[in-house]
């Protein structure tokens, strides 16, 4: 849903993309939170934010685009290693497609988290997407 207007994102907006070689550094990643569910537990909660850069937002006619993924997992690696692996795999997936769009980023993230990383139990997605009104 577009947070500015409250309208649902259309399929055309979801599939609207730009070639990956037209935008430098199209995505950036940030660890928002990494903690155990409760002390002594082996399950961790890691929240990763995927941010679209200015050039990509401009090409896709967006004002703001944040995708927050909350991972519930049993991975024992550090949060930086999880982020590095996730971002490398996502860029590899997007390079193979050749086009970056919201839909492709979401498909790539779900492919990596459910197919490649085997210790991920559950993923929840929240987003903040705002399209330009003019």
Curated annotation (Swiss-Prot):
Keywords: Host-virus interaction. Pfam families: Gemini_AL3. InterPro entries: Gemini_AL3 (IPR000657). One of its GO terms (biological process) is viral process. It comes from the Viruses. Belongs to the geminiviridae replication enhancer protein family. Increases viral DNA accumulation. Enhances infectivity and symptom expression. Homooligomer. Interacts with the replication-associated protein (REP). Interacts with host proliferating cell nuclear antigen (PCNA). Interacts with host retinoblastoma-related protein 1 (RBR1), and may thereby deregulate the host cell cycle. Oligomerization and interaction with PCNA are necessary for optimal replication enhancement. This is Replication enhancer protein. It comes from Mungbean yellow mosaic virus (strain Vigna).
